[in-house]
Amino acid sequence: MNDLAYWPGAKSLPKNDKFASKRKDINNFDHVDKIWEYLKLKYGDTIAVNDLRGKNKEKFSYSELANLITKVSLSFKYYGLVKGDVVTLISENSPRWLIADQGLMRLGAINAVRGVNSPSVELEYIIEHSNSVGLIVQSKDVWLKLNKKDELKKRLKFIINLEDEEFENLINWPEFIKVGEKEYLKNNSFEKDISHINDVASILYTSGTTGKPKGVPLTHKNFLHQIINLAYIADPTPGTSVLSVLPIWHSYERSAEYFFFSCGCTQFYTNPKFLKDDIKLVKPVVMATVPRLWEAIHDGFYLALKKMPPKKQRFLKFLIKNSSVFKRN
């Protein structure tokens, strides 16, 4: 991991800034994971996350999410994880991804993240390059695509399957949660807080299309800066519906999600296949997106428009031409 390129930290909002007063509590944290107890007290029964299209279709309130993060962090501790350890997390968006991510941070551990569609050689490189001591996979299918399974079984402290299914020696999600619940009942506490804002929180890897993937460590300071300063762009109220479609293992989507959670929003997970249906279902007030997504929607709209009767085409084109952009003051 010696060749990692660190992203510089950024300055906090000035204290006299109009957004700073709303973010003053967040501004005092030195670790991303510390926001959850604060959010639990502030937003409690408000739904934090709702997985619309995942296999388990789970949803959790802020209280439930905070409690699960604590239990999961105790599970990681039980399996021998300590501050500074790296765990590779290979999964797409889901509440379980988020819980594992924040449970790792609670211990001061670091996650190296990637999506499930990456080639096996790339995933194995990330596990090795990051010096990971543990592995979390979305499903047994992700585990089965890896070539060095026997070597990983011997070397890693644990291999966790985020699904309920039992498979080989993988620790399934219910079993992992059960360990945390037992540790929680023992009043098992964490060691003295030695967290620091410059601790590495996560390692993001490039796609590797032009060579080996390159790892970029992001610190808690990097993420906290986004959580505080994204208020310049969006200022949602608690309970606001947010539709999340971009991969959570990308820095942009991840920072945006942390920010929306910090505002008490309700985030709905979808995927590109169901985006059209879920926009109608959720009626989101805000989304974190990229131009390519809207270009695809734009092209799809005009393709459908061409198939409509001429009179309807003219009417819709008139409405588009005379529409205006809404801008927030």
Report the location of each language-model feature.
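Structural core segment of the AMP-binding/adenylate-forming
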Residues: M1-D3, R106-V179
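Conserved pre-ATP/AMP-binding loop-to-beta segment of ANL
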Residues: I47, E181-Y205, K212, D235-S241
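Conserved ATP-dependent adenylate/AMP-binding module captured primarily in the ANL superfamily
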Residues: V116-K148, Q226-L243, K273-V286
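ANL superfamily adenylate-forming
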Residues: G54, W143-I197, F301-N329
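Conserved AMP-binding/adenylation subdomain of ANL enzymes
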Residues: L224-S241, I248-N329
